[in-house]
Amino acid sequence: MIRTEEMLLNVGPQHPSTHGVFRLVIKIDGEIIKEATPVIGYLHRGTEKIAESLQYTQIIPYTDRMDYLSAMTNNYVICHAVETMMGLEIPERAEYLRVLAMELGRIASHLVWWGTNLLDIGAVSPFLYAFREREMIINLLNELCGARLTFNYMRVGGVKWDAPDGWIEKVEEFVPYMREQLAGYHDLVSGNEIFLNRVKGVGIYSEEDAISYSLSGANLRCTGVNWDLRKDEPYSIYDRFDFDIPVGSVGDAWDRYVCRMKEIEESLKIVEQAVQQFPKEGAVLAKVPKIIKAPKGEAFVRIESPRGEIGCYIASDGKKEPYRLKFRRPSFYNLQILPKLLKGENIANLITILGGVDIVLGEVDG
């Protein structure tokens, strides 16, 4: 009888497939993972505590640096929370610009996930195609707000700048181009036998597991739970758009892949409709004081980011800074199921499973 010895192995914190400073301590017996322990906090910056000494507008750039692949949704959630407390009515043109910015950001975020996830499991060319299209989106957002990654675009009451001349037309032209490229992505990857063998039946969890671990986004919907805040608790102007919510059935890495790829298609639908409905004129910022003071009280709002439900709780004592601010960061919750998924798996599936969960370390650590 062959006797094997268990070994502790560190994955990270400097490891290309973790996409950030994330450490995973795994106990392996041969090639089987017996135990996995995530070690987080390497990127903790104390955002919530810092916010207690900042004016509300000053907090917005800090949200850019949480989920830095989807900064627009982070901008929105803090603004939405303050607007809810103040009872502000947002100009219609600003709402459309917000939706366009958030949905373009969602597509760009999923493209990063698609390209890097496939690169990690051995497919090189998809990474190049994904970043080619992402660069086009980044250029569009750069024209809109003057930044490529950390946008600081949204403001309490609307947005900082109106769309430049010709910008809406460029977005309109991008939609059919992206649809064509997406079909090419499926031809290249989605039916590839090697890829299917790497993802089908790997990292399975049930609907009950997803709910008990407070998963959200594609990590929840891959189990068959049809829940998306843009549909189920519409915010902004999402109730004006016709789009579907992709769901899976098995809850494996393949279902998570399919959900995110279909989400790109649905985001393109939203962008297309937003362009068609875009108001020809109007203000982009409500009349708000230069120094914003939220009234005494509390507010909690939540929205759908590319990684799931991001929430913002604010307690105000009537001053220009929040008394307490708390973010519900979806990557932090989604990461909790990783030890359960990895236990008993072959070590070769580790990166497939981690990539399928799609965490961003700036958001995990706060």
From Swiss-Prot:
GO terms for cellular component: plasma membrane
Alphabetically ordered keywords of this record: Cell membrane, Membrane, NAD, Quinone, Translocase, Transport
Reactions catalysed according to its record: a quinone + NADH + 5 H(+)(in) = a quinol + NAD(+) + 4 H(+)(out)
Disulfide bonds: none
Keyword NAD belongs to the record: yes
GO molecular function per UniProt: NAD binding; NADH:ubiquinone reductase (non-electrogenic) activity; quinone binding
The keyword RNA-binding appears for this protein: no
Membrane disposition: Peripheral membrane protein
Main location: membrane
Function: NDH-1 shuttles electrons from NADH, via FMN and iron-sulfur (Fe-S) centers, to quinones in the respiratory chain. The immediate electron acceptor for the enzyme in this species is believed to be a menaquinone. Couples the redox reaction to proton translocation (for every two electrons transferred, four hydrogen ions are translocated across the cytoplasmic membrane), and thus conserves the redox energy in a proton gradient.
Subunit structure, as described in the record: NDH-1 is composed of 14 different subunits. Subunits NuoB, C, D, E, F, and G constitute the peripheral sector of the complex.
Protein name: NADH-quinone oxidoreductase subunit D
Organism: Bacillus cereus (strain ATCC 10987 / NRS 248)
